[in-house]
Amino acid sequence: MNRSMNQVLARHFTAVNASLGRSKCRVLRAWGPNQLDSEWPKARNHPDLDLTLVAHGATFNGNRIDDGTRLLLKHLDPGEGTALDLGCGNGVIAAVLARRGLETTAIDVSWSAVAATRATAQANGLDIDVRWADGLSGFPDHSFDVITTNPPFHQGHAKESEPTLRMFDEAARVLRPGGQLWCVFNSHLPWRRELAARVGRTRVVAQDRNYQLTFTHL
């Protein structure tokens, strides 16, 4: 820890004290938090969707729409019933589902995403049940008619497939008979094969240079 940390803490607290150094370590004590104006959350209007997206600082892709999600939204035809947006981010997919009249639940493992999706729902006057959840263990079998997801394939900088594969298994459990799973992912990933093996009949709906959108039907 270098001395610049003193300056960082001093911007946010009224008093900062540093102990004597020992073995290249120091203890920093800071107290009296300053009241600072926050630039977050930030909102952005998307006229093509007639939606306002809201994001906090750690929300995936901020208040923008990534290319994979755009591909999904272009082709999404969810029908009616109950829907789950798995890994909701800034809430754009959940907002589209809710606007189309589906009873929509949105979950994410990131508290920033949960707060962003709630703010997006409020900004657009939509009723979305937004929850923090790490997976689908809290949902009973056959809970949803439709699941949408743009799943991650890395944890930090390390590629990690196990969480996504576990998510596919859980999706198969919570979907109702005849249910749909819409999944968009990087084209080089083998998720189509895994979806067919773990969930049900899977076909490619659309594909571009970077992303593949699949539709799985139970």
List each language-model region with its residue ranges.
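Conserved beta-strand signature within the Rossmann-like core of class I S-adenosyl-L-methionine
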Residues: 1, 178-184
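SAM-dependent Rossmann-like transferase core, predominantly class I methyltransferases
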Residues: 23-81
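Short beta->alpha hinge that forms the Motif I/post-I loop of the SAM-binding pocket
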Residues: 108-113, 163, 186-187
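Conserved SAM/SAH cofactor-binding pocket of Class I
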Residues: 67-149, 155
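A short glycine-rich, Lys/Arg-flanked "PGG" loop and its adjoining helix->strand segment in the class I
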Residues: 165-177
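General small-molecule cofactor/ligand-binding pocket signal
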Residues: 17-19, 54, 129-131, 203-205
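Accessory substrate-recognition/RNA-binding modules or partner subunits associated with SAM-dependent
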Residues: 1-32, 167, 192-199, 206-209
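C-terminal catalytic and target-recognition region of SAM-dependent MTase-like enzymes
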Residues: 182-218
